Swiss-Prot record:
SUPFAM superfamilies to which the protein is assigned, alphabetical: Radical SAM enzymes
Classification via InterPro entries: Aldolase_TIM, CofH/MnqC-like_C, Cyclic_DHFL_synthase_mqnC, Elp3/MiaA/NifB-like_rSAM, F420, FO_synthase_su2, rSAM
Gene Ontology BP terms: menaquinone biosynthetic process
Name of this chain's protein: Cyclic dehypoxanthine futalosine synthase
Cofactor annotation comment: Binds 1 [4Fe-4S] cluster. The cluster is coordinated with 3 cysteines and an exchangeable S-adenosyl-L-methionine.
General function of this protein: Radical SAM enzyme that catalyzes the cyclization of dehypoxanthine futalosine (DHFL) into cyclic dehypoxanthine futalosine (CDHFL), a step in the biosynthesis of menaquinone (MK, vitamin K2).
Lineage, highest ranks first: Bacteria, Bacillati, Actinomycetota, Actinomycetes, Kitasatosporales
EC number: 1.21.98.1
Pfam name, any one: Radical_SAM
Key words, A-Z: 4Fe-4S, Iron, Iron-sulfur, Menaquinone biosynthesis, Metal-binding, Oxidoreductase, S-adenosyl-L-methionine
Gene it is expressed from: mqnC
Length: 399
């Protein structure tokens, strides 16, 4: 372990563009003064984005949950229903999904996340049909969806290789993977919270296959389910090693565990200081990953704003619909003007981005800020009472 007095040279080296080791990252994450760690991370960000370092981005997207039926039963999840639970379980029909896509386009959204449970009947063919239908009706929408866990599941259902599954859903319309299912990659914490999911090594292997086929992804981390600091850094190390080989991870997105309505209820959550330290150490350690995304959805708008001073260059999405983390207690909401204002008050120029992080609209003049009260995050969508396999669903106004 490095003595605290010896940490500043490591911070200086990282700020100047040098690579740090996992051991050094653990020392910094655990012991470096928060302000010093944040300053080094911000220096890395400014160096990487010299010329556009004054800009912070956001995206308008919709998370379309196509089913909550799932065989995986992760202990941190409050969203899923067991396959035999006909009172709680539901699936959306294609017409409903296409209607939600139409609303997304109308509100200026550019991306959809297709997220749901590991349904025992949904193989590759299901995703091919749905992605192809979405692309036919809305070719302008980017389908940034799923992750290695869904690929492993659909390939098993359809009795095909993971490589074939990726090729087929990519050809049908999938543009990139959302990094879903990473949770915690090291073996011990992963088995504790998601014992039925593939291993962390397998998750990375599938993402590496996808990158090799030209399908990029983001990477994520679920914080605060009982993992150690060393396991958090090991998660980063595993991502960095794959990124050295593929370059296919566009961004890293840590988010915090929400404790309501799940089997881990009462578990000590990651503190907001731990979250900011993770944003900072991720920016310092992941020297080969372009973007670090701050999350206001699980931590709140003020902490999301603070993340822009700790290495984040992006504030995530104005998520027009989200049901998964909200079911576990995340109740933060925002709208487009609030996100623009948060970024501006952090001393940055806000910009709406594409999935691939190109700037679509730079809001450099407040007088020209967009005004549309319908562009609101976190509109929940839940099933009407009933227990059929495909009940009618409705969109509820935010409360």
């Amino acid at each position: 372990m490095t003595e605290k007095a010896d940490l500043q040279p490591i911070l200086d080296r990282a700020a100047a563009g040098g690579r740090i080791t996992p051991e050094e990252a653990l020392d910094l994450y655990r012991d470096a003064p928060l302000h010093a760690l944040g300053a080094a991370a911000d220096a890395v960000r400014r160096r990487r984005y010299a010329g556009t370092e004054h800009i912070a981005t956001y995206i308008i997207e919709r998370n379309i949950n196509y089913t909550n039926v799932c065989v995986t039963a992760c202990k941190f999840c409050a969203f899923y229903a067991a396959p035999k639970d006909t009172k709680k379980g539901w699936s959306r029909d294609l017409d409903d999904i296409l209607r939600r896509c139409a609303e997304t386009v109308e509100l200026g959204g550019t991306q959809i996340m297709f997220q749901g449970g590991h349904h025992p009947d949904y193989g590759v063919e299901y995703y091919e049909e749905h992605f192809a239908a979405i692309k036919k009706e809305f070719p302008q929408l980017v389908i940034h969806s799923l992750g290695a866990s869904e690929v492993e599941h659909m390939a098993r259902i359809s009795k095909v290789s993971v490589e074939e599954a990726i090729r087929r859903i990519h050809a049908a319309g999938l543009d990139s993977f959302a990094g879903a299912g990473a949770e915690l990659l090291p073996e011990r914490p992963r088995k504790a919270i998601a014992p039925l999911k593939e291993s962390g090594e397998r998750w990375l292997e599938i993402m590496e296959i996808a990158h090799g086929l030209g399908v990029e992804s983001t990477s994520t981390m679920l914080m605060g389910t009982g993992e150690t600091n060393a396991e958090r850094i090991e998660h980063l190390r595993m991502i960095r090693d794959v990124q050295d080989r593929t370059g296919g991870f566009r961004a890293f997105i840590p988010y915090t565990y929400q404790p309501e309505n799940n089997h881990l209820k009462g578990r000590t959550q990651a503190t907001l200081f731990e979250y900011l330290r993770m944003i900072a150490i991720a920016r310092v350690f992941l020297d080969n990953v372009a973007h670090i995304q701050g999350s206001w959805l699980t931590t709140g708008k003020e902490v999301g704003q603070l993340s822009l001073h700790y290495g984040a260059d992006d504030l995530g999405s104005i998520m027009l619909e989200e049901n998964v983390v909200s079911s576990a207690g995340a109740k933060h909401r925002s709208n487009r003007l609030e996100i623009i204002d948060l970024i501006r008050k952090a001393g940055r120029v806000p910009a709406q981005r594409a999935t691939t992080y190109e700037h679509l609209v730079v809001h450099d003049d407040p007088a020209n800020d967009p005004v549309d009260e319908r562009v609101v995050s976190h509109i929940s969508s839940t099933a009407i009472e009933g227990g059929t396999a495909h009940p009618e669903l409705k969109l509820l106004a935010p409360n």
